[in-house]
């Protein structure tokens, strides 16, 4: 597979065209950002850790019947992925209260949420990813009603799979975001990534934060903690 021109450069990943029009290369960089890019640092090995972690999780989801974009690891920091027409919203599920939910609603951090809360956010850094709902998505043509329903169903399916996976490894899946796209056949497919950059994970016993909040809050040992998460899941890095 031949890497060609850069298609898109995000805060922590770069996407490249390939010589196959249906395939892209997803490159995980060491860049680490928070607060819509206001805080940025380079963390050694982070690109490698996130690339391999993402491949591990996406493989678990494929085994559970969730179609994903990831095809193969092709280097320590790169994966071959299917080309998708990405839907410009994030699907967020919250199992415990944390982050922006606590700030918005004034609730206590760590409150169990039953049922889990589902939220949509528009992917727009300039607007700080505002919350939107089904009506916004339909009115602005970002997705159809059928696609909205499919994204919700898949997001909750992912929740069932990954809550159990992390629970068995002594961790709580507090919340996470997913992004979906449409493949060449019109199917909704899970894209982007699932890494500790895009979810919150706490140790079940101590409530130690094991995700990008370590970077946001200056807790240190970011990559070391990501590696600990991976190793608890049985992924040797």
Curated annotation (Swiss-Prot):
GO terms for cellular component: cytosol. Keywords: ATP-binding, Ligase, Nucleotide-binding, Purine biosynthesis. Its EC number is 6.3.2.6. The keyword Nucleotide-binding applies. GO terms for biological process: 'de novo' IMP biosynthetic process; cobalamin biosynthetic process. This is Phosphoribosylaminoimidazole-succinocarboxamide synthase. GO terms for molecular function: ATP binding; phosphoribosylaminoimidazolesuccinocarboxamide synthase activity. It catalyses: 5-amino-1-(5-phospho-D-ribosyl)imidazole-4-carboxylate + L-aspartate + ATP = (2S)-2-[5-amino-1-(5-phospho-beta-D-ribosyl)imidazole-4-carboxamido]succinate + ADP + phosphate + 2 H(+). SUPFAM superfamilies: SAICAR synthase-like. Pathway: Purine metabolism; IMP biosynthesis via de novo pathway; 5-amino-1-(5-phospho-D-ribosyl)imidazole-4-carboxamide from 5-amino-1-(5-phospho-D-ribosyl)imidazole-4-carboxylate: step 1/2. InterPro entries: SAICAR_synt/ADE2_N, SAICAR_synt_PurC, SAICAR_synth, SAICAR_synthetase, SAICAR_synthetase_CS. Belongs to the SAICAR synthetase family.
